[in-house]
């Protein structure tokens, strides 16, 4: 039963959806990294439900940093973030009625009935709040050494955005100040319409996200079990709702030939670059100096307002369930900062392993 990820830089998550609080512990960070409270709050606001596209559960996310920060900088000791739960409604849930495609029955089998089942408990998307708070600190550390991360919605239902350019830095920079995680206004409007249409039908909708990492040096990662792709996949699949991942051209590679998919190399200002980026910035599990790019499949939110067939696993009986709680018609908008955060965790861990604990502190002028 493990809730910790990482080797050199680790993150532990704790708490439940309707418990007193949710939180995170970051360990292995270099001392002296600046902690930007404004950026942390901005990242939390990107994850927070704010519109008709999201759940009606409104949480202020008034975080507290209990340890690991002194006078605005990391101390190098475990950094603990706690976010109180201030708006719970446990009466919306009935223990024993397994919500289709939720973790209710699986959790009951694993924890023998001792799990906190209210609102999904430890499996709830609520636990991504401290993940995003911790991720804000990690993203700031990466920015200090010239590494940026951005995620947009590539597809939601039948609505599409354009993909990142092969050199994605300008697109990633544009996302930092965007109100909606799309690269074009037309896509933002079409995606919003798709989500609202699902809500009107008491249904939900999924989609595809695309994440880009710019500025990573070549040579980061390991060749086999700790490859960049392996670790990013591990972290990404920790997010509830993610059901698939591909890097670069991914599954489109099966439709062509090597002459179509290979990335030709050339020199540019004394640096090795590729003409295209169909391999997503990774060869042999190791970064090649180009942008790391991957897409994730995000399933429709399983909580919908239509009657569904299920079981009462306490009684051993078939049952029908209509969910009346406060839920998202799509999580794909709110999942973008979560993807940025787990990506930052993997990268900080790998960079620290490759270059040492103080590498990330170089960006802070230390």
Locate each region found by the language model.
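Generic N-terminal targeting/processing segments that precede catalytic cores or assembly contacts
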Residues: 1-366
């Amino acid at each position: 039963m493990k809730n910790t990820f990482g080797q050199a830089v680790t993150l532990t998550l704790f708490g439940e959806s309707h418990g007193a609080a949710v939180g995170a512990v970051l360990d292995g960070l270099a001392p002296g990294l600046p902690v930007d409270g404004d950026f942390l709050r901005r990242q939390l606001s990107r994850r927070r439900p704010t519109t008709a596209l999201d759940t009606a559960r409104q949480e202020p996310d008034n975080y507290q940093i209990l340890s690991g920060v002194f006078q605005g900088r990391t101390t190098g000791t475990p950094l603990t973030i706690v976010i109180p739960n201030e708006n719970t409604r446990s009466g919306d849930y009935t223990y024993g009625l397994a919500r289709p495609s939720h973790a209710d029955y699986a959790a009951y089998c694993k924890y023998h009935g001792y799990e906190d089942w209210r609102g999904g408990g430890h499996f709830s998307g609520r636990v991504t709040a401290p993940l995003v708070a911790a991720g804000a600190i990690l993203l700031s550390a990466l920015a200090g050494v010239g590494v940026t991360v951005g995620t947009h919605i590539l597809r939601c239902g039948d609505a599409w955005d354009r993909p990142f350019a092969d050199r994605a830095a300008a697109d990633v920079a544009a996302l930092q100040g965007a109100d909606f995680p799309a690269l074009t206004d037309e896509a933002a409007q079409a995606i919003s319409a798709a989500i609202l249409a699902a809500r009107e039908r008491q249904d939900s909708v999924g989609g595809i996200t695309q994440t880009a990492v710019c500025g990573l040096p070549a040579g980061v990662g390991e060749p086999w079990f700790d490859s960049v792709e392996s670790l990013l996949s591990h972290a990404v699949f920790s997010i509830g709702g993610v059901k698939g991942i591909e890097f670069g051209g991914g599954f489109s590679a099966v439709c062509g030939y090597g002459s179509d998919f290979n990335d030709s190399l050339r020199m540019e200002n004394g640096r090795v670059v590729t003409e295209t980026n169909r391999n997503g910035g990774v060869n042999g599990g190791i970064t090649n100096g180009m942008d790391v790019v991957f897409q994730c499949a995000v399933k429709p939110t399983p909580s919908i307002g239509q009657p569904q067939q299920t079981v009462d696993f306490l009684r051993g009986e078939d049952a029908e369930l209509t969910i009346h709680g406060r839920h998202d018609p799509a999580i794909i908008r709110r999942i973008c900062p979560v993807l940025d955060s787990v990506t930052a965790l993997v990268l900080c861990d790998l960079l620290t392993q490759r270059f040492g604990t103080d590498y990330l502190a170089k960006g802070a002028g230390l």
